């Protein structure tokens, strides 16, 4: 049984990902779309961390399912960090590139991890744990990226010869803070097939919960519509605010080269 997982990242002009220039400017909350930028510079910063984040999200679902008694993902070879096993040509590559080229919100996802909830030792508990595992992983990655920004900033300052490598890693980690918090909050949307729907259904009366889970393809349409309405910005605001809070605390460790990298990519 396969569960469709969709990951989202909306990139903004004054995004929380943006570094303060020369370590003096405060980080602003996102309010508008990312300006058109050279594709190569943007992909250098976005693609590695986005790919790793959505793969980690799916891996977490499969691993949590294994711990709850479902060995489906393990038997099919999906409990691996090999990106080739998780990449979906359409959702992971072509669709994000097409949306980026059209200056639209970027929708991307990894190949869904196969899961059979009927194998859970406790269906309800297992379903909730597996559904929240991906979200928890993205939050953990955001915190890990925060640590990477701090470490690379310290090393880059103390060892000038390493500042080039450190600035690239720091820029990707900086983007990763906001990106992973957005992925976590987006997947909490209570719209099937997103993770939040697997929690909300247990708060509804049984008859209503069954109809709610049968939304199917209409749920994807609802999500796509939300992406083009102000409602999604309100829903994602906790992610924006959290990213801004974390990044503001890191301003003193930002390398000048990092600021230049993000400026070139128009973050």
Language-model regions, residue ranges each:
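Hydrophobic transmembrane alpha-helices and their immediate loop junctions
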Residues: 2-267
């Amino acid at each position: 049984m396969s569960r469709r997982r969709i990951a989202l990242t909306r990139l903004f002009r004054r995004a929380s990902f943006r570094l303060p220039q020369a370590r003096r400017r405060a980080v602003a909350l996102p309010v508008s779309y990312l300006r058109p930028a050279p594709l190569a510079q943007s992909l250098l910063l976005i693609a590695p961390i986005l790919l790793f984040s959505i793969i980690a999200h799916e891996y977490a679902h499969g691993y949590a399912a294994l711990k709850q008694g479902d060995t489906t993902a393990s038997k099919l070879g999906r409990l691996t960090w090999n990106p080739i096993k998780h990449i979906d040509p359409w959702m992971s590559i072509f669709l994000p590139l097409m949306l980026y080229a059209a200056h639209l919100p970027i929708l991307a996802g990894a190949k869904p991890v196969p899961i059979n909830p009927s194998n859970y030792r406790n269906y309800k508990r297992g379903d909730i744990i597996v559904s929240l595992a991906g979200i928890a992983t993205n939050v953990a990655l955001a915190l890990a990226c925060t640590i990477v920004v701090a470490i690379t900033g310290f090393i880059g300052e103390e060892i000038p010869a390493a500042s080039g490598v450190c600035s690239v890693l720091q820029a990707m980690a900086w983007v990763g803070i906001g990106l992973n918090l957005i992925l976590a909050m987006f997947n909490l949307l209570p719209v099937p097939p997103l993770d939040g729907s697997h929690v909300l259904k247990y708060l509804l009366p049984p008859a209503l919960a069954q109809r709610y889970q049968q939304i199917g393809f209409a749920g994807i349409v609802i999500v796509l519509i939300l992406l083009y309405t102000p409602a999604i910005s309100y829903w994602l605001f906790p992610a924006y605010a959290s990213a801004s809070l974390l990044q503001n605390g890191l301003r003193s460790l930002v390398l000048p080269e990092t600021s230049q990298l993000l400026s070139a990519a128009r973050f």
